[in-house]
Amino acid sequence: MTKWFNVGKIVNTHGVKGEIRVVSLTDFPEERYKVGNTLYISNEKGGEPFPVKITSHRQHKTFDLLTFEGYGNVNEVEQFKGSLLKVPEDQLGELAEGEYYYHEIIGCNVVTEEGEALGTIKEVLSPGANDVWVIKRPKGQDLLIPYIDDVVLQVNIENKLVTIHVMEGLL
């Protein structure tokens, strides 16, 4: 059975020429939405995702706008509103050392270098220069950890464990 990963959500159409407005859920939108790539649409009703080939991609405000081969007007893409864009696991590709997919990081337990448990990574934010990991703490407010070498000391994906150095003012 194929394992699928969400890379975007179709939230609306854009214009009359078949463009769709996508909220990106992928780590690498410029790579994932490249012209010629194949994505899979999974509608809200379930069922097996079906392939579509990207014929154009551009960014508009906070959205990615895509068109697909064979879908040239708004009436043909209207049916996709609310659907998810997916890729199979074999399309994920290899990452460089020290790079991780969001789904690998989310759910990892976070401990200090002294072994104190801080919580679990629940979300990854990409505000600018580096990612920020949102740690759900057992009690209290969420903790924001920058993904930089000075803070993140070790990431063990197999054991779902991240070890961090607590810099002054971080907690």
UniProtKB/Swiss-Prot annotation:
SUPFAM superfamilies: PRC-barrel domain, Translation proteins. It comes from the Bacteria. InterPro entries: PRC-brl_dom (IPR027275), PRC_barrel-like_sf (IPR011033), RimM (IPR011961), RimM_N (IPR002676), RimM_N_sf (IPR036976), Transl_B-barrel_sf (IPR009000). It is found in: Cytoplasm. GO terms for biological process: ribosomal small subunit biogenesis; rRNA processing. One of its GO terms (molecular function) is ribosome binding. One of its GO terms (cellular component) is cytoplasm. Residues 97-170 form the PRC barrel domain. Keywords: Chaperone, Cytoplasm, Ribosome biogenesis, rRNA processing. Pfam families: PRC, RimM. The keyword Cytoplasm applies. Belongs to the RimM family. Binds ribosomal protein uS19. The PRC barrel domain binds ribosomal protein uS19. An accessory protein needed during the final step in the assembly of 30S ribosomal subunit, possibly for assembly of the head region. Essential for efficient processing of 16S rRNA. May be needed both before and after RbfA during the maturation of 16S rRNA. It has affinity for free ribosomal 30S subunits but not for 70S ribosomes. PANTHER family: RIBOSOME MATURATION FACTOR RIMM. This is Ribosome maturation factor RimM. It comes from Bacillus cereus (strain ZK / E33L).
